[in-house]
Amino acid sequence: MKRLILMLIVGAMLFALLSCSGKNNAPDGKTYTDNYVYTMWKTSDTSTYTLYRINVLSATGTPVCPDPLCGHDTNECPFYGINTEGSGIVGSGIYYLRGSVPMQHCRQVCRFDLESGKLAILYENSAATIAKLFVFDDYVYFLELVGDGKESPTYTFRLMRYGIHDGKTADLGNTGAAKNTDIYACVDGRLYWEDHDSASCFSTDTDGRNRVDGDRLSDRTRSGNYSVMIENVQPADREYINMYTCNVVSKDLTTGETQTIIRNNPSFPMVYDGKVFYYRFQEEPLLIGYIVDEESNERKQIFDARGTKLYICDFDGQNDRLLCDIAGSGYLFGITNSMLWSSGNGEYYCTTLISYRQSEDGQTVERGNNAIVVINIKTGSYKIADME
């Protein structure tokens, strides 16, 4: 089983819901709409991930990089070394971090213009690491890790701000933030921060000052009069390839009452366009292969708990229904949180599909090919994307 886990688990799962926005307000007040959703992807003939956009009408995915000859593996590519954490689209611009090492040691804050195909480096500091990015309608904030220059340096996080409207960068100084601190909202002239390790929270003004400890928005993930949260995260049975289950709880923002709307969800749900996307634990689990237990040398069956069905409901648990079933496609649903952004068309959602195969020696189950599926969230119709 240890061997199976090492082969199948890549990266770490965030203990949070992912929320996306279907509209993007340009600095000139216009809305940039191009019927695309965005995700990171690599084709079978390369080892390099790059940013793709998928046309939701044709289900065709192409690299966002405008150079058809680019291998996406050098600094000449605008998305080489991209760190998508905290990135976002405002108007026709994608705002993201970039560095010499992909997903690490970011030195640049960048904007890629989807209309012109041009990259602009908004801020660069070769002597510091940019650790966090937070994109809002008016400002892009980022935390810069800076040493004090001593032989045994002490590092602090300096808050920086780039104005989307005026193009000016401001050094807001040391606000006492740490690497595990996020700015999760900018509302009515206040920044709302949350420290994930200590579960503490506070707010500041948009200059990072006038701190109020304990101040938080009532709920971070909401739609209408309801918000949703995750509770009771539990490890799944060893017979399942899925590693955990959780309950999804709905909260009435007027009364404060909560109710569990989804139980035993074998993945963290996706929150998008006022809906909750989730899987149901399979009553008849899908057999995906066999493993040989390293301790007992016994050959055992291994199952997938997510299966081929994706469900959808409102934040209050109403209008709960099967959205689509991809049985017969040759794939199973993977983790729901794979779509980065939607630029203009909120009727579509994309996520990763996965497959499994028995290893050549018959000792374990391996991951097969992946795919991207584009789903119409109103009709449930779907297409497997052709990723060029």
Predicted regions and their residues:
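A short beta-strand motif characteristic of beta-propeller blades
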Residues: T62-C65, L69-P78, K118-E124, K168-N174, ...
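Blade-level signature of beta-propeller repeat domains, shared across WD40, Kelch, NHL, RCC1
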Residues: S343-E388
